[in-house]
Amino acid sequence: MKTNPTAYAPETDALDYWESLEGMFTVVKKPHVLGPQYKGDIYVLGEDFTGLPLNNIGGLNLRPHAQNTATIPIYVGNQFVAKAKDYFAEDVTGVVTYRNSFYKVEPTQQLTVQDGGLQRQAAQTQPSEDKLTIASYNIENFSANNDKNETPEDKVTLIANSFIHEIHNPDIITLIEVQDNNGSVDDGTTSGLESGRKLANRIKELGGKSYEYTEVAPVDGADGGKPGSNIRLGILYNPERVSLAKKEAATSNEAAQFDKGHLVKNPARIAPNDPSFDHTRKSLAVEFEFKGQPVVVIANHLKSKIGDDAIYGASQPAVEHTLPTREAQASVIHQFVQEGLKQNPKTTFVLTGDFNDYDFSTTAQILAGSELTNLMSQHDAGDRYSYFYRGSNQVLDNIFISNNMAAKARFEPVHINASFMKEHGRASDHDPVLVQIDFSGAQTSGTPTDDQQGNIGQATEQTSPSSSNTGTQLVPHQAQANEQKSSTSESKEKDKDEDEKQEDKEEAATETKTPGKRKILPSTGQETSYLALFGVAVVTMSLIWYKKKRTTY
């Protein structure tokens, strides 16, 4: 992203740096893969990358106010199978091109990737009698329709098995992207009870617990997502472990309310008629009782990022058009939690879901306020991700909990999807996240101390290094190939990236931009630090090439 669109500065600006390499042969030194192949692209770092600290799987976590522009996209085609930590034993040579609002390297050689050994993991958190376990999982357009283009049976089995063997039968499961019973068949169907029950039945068939399912169906066509599918939030719960507060369920347009600290109707959607929730999913509030204690679980799926400017697109500086809507939604949800805690300070609130925003975002800050703790932001920084997009591990799935129970909570993302492809067992584009809350003692009050928060996870931040730590990894080949510019680059001024995956798939058809304050996207990455060294390195390599040109060619 350019902060000054009128100045050309390849030494300090990511967009200009890539533009300076377009059409040139380049070499990426023995790269390692950062995430799964998606729509023909993989993202890599060269072996000579010495910039930002890597996370626990050798990737780069997205950071505040920056994009990881040091990552290099390589076009490998849709049949190429690769996952995080895989690597290439040889250098990759190719031509820098531009398509779909992004620069990438198109190899001039046959590529063979080596297995880096990364495995899907199971949660360390185990069931316990006095501890309540809540999981959150975006199950990516799930319905009872098993047609080829809907939810095939093998996906149902994969997700069901993950709840049994990898998440260990949590007591409550919040489900994101549950579709209506027939999926994208647009016939006016809104109920998703068959979809939720199909998953519950498959879990039981495979040896898991017996779950019940609850939801509030949306108004037909009003909540965004894939046309005709009516995605919504749903909740599975184990009635042998928790009891659903016995109340009449709210209708689609009835707003959740508290009376003496308890939901008037259960389940109910939060402010379904608020303008900030137009054409997007409404948050679902459900009240349970565990060991005699009230627990209100709020499942969320906030507005997607479709509509934001691409960081290398024609509009510069790039603007995050969708952020004001998520901030407004967060404010509505936070006010709801405040009212519940005001009426009954001993209620445990747990907010889960796909917030379509990061753990460090203003959206997360508004949601937390002074009443809640974001457990993801307290977790080990090297393990702090649930999603992979455009070269960065990042957080879209957070869990917030009442401050009075934060010190009694154990949080864990379960990395079974985001770093992998379907060939490795991936069932969704999101990793599930879970929290286990210890109810064995009396509830405490107030905000947890620093020592108490330390029990949640290591809060070690991945701070930005000085610019002197960064080495180059993408250098021009000795022979320029401007004449080999890809014909696909001709669309650079008008292409909109069709695979912007910070979304609930084809939501663009139904979501509308919300006017409001404009927020600048995080900068494209250390423009004044490691990108400056990229430029210096390129200049240095160019000088070396020039001196050797007569003897080399």
What role is predicted for each listed range?
Residues 33-34, 139-144, 178-182, 218-223, ...:
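Solvent-exposed loop/turn segments at secondary-structure junctions
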Residues 1-133, 137, 141-145, 150-169, ...:
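Extended non-catalytic accessory segments flanking core domains
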Residues 442-532, 552-553:
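Intrinsically disordered, low-complexity repeat and linker tracts
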Residues 285, 289, 296, 322-351:
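His/acidic metal-ligating clusters that form di-metal
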Residues 28, 83-118, 238-280, 337-349, ...:
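Metal-dependent phosphoester-hydrolase catalytic domains
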Residues 102-233, 308-319, 325-334, 346, ...:
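N-terminal, active-site-proximal structural segment of metallo-dependent hydrolase catalytic domains
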Residues 192-303:
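Structured beta-strand-rich core segments of catalytic domains in phosphoester-bond hydrolases
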